[in-house]
Amino acid sequence: MNQERYLKAIDERCSRRTYITKDIEVEKVNSLQRCIKNLNEMSGLNLQLQLNGPKLFKGFSSSYGMLKGVGAYFALVGSKDDKDLLEKVGYFGEILALEATALGLGTCWIGGTYDRKLCAKLIDLKENEELVAIITVGYTPVDKTFKEKMISKLSHR
């Protein structure tokens, strides 16, 4: 992604927790997969795009009711032995979020309000790897929902 595209995505990006039922087009999935391949080569991480969001985010208990309609997510995975794992996941994960934003998709970083054991079964997780976080991704309503506005107010003081 070029610098101008990044700067525009930085200005546009905001956390979105409500998604609409619309599959991400093949061209956009392919673009995200190319980005992931490049980032994994640069970082040594095992970032993944998963299109099985409904399996992971079904029901209230899996996300405390804070997410709705999740169809896809990025699994942010890396080696347990990497002393810089958290820093790398933060840096390269945000690049993924910006790439998704540039493609017209919404994103939300999720640290712990999902079923980690189920997620580990749904993704490609090797024995020496750790799932650090996920980023939900997909199409969102044009305007934030009332719930999203309230959550945003509570989390940004």
Residues covered by each model-derived region:
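Acidic, surface-exposed loops and disordered segments
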Residues: 1-157
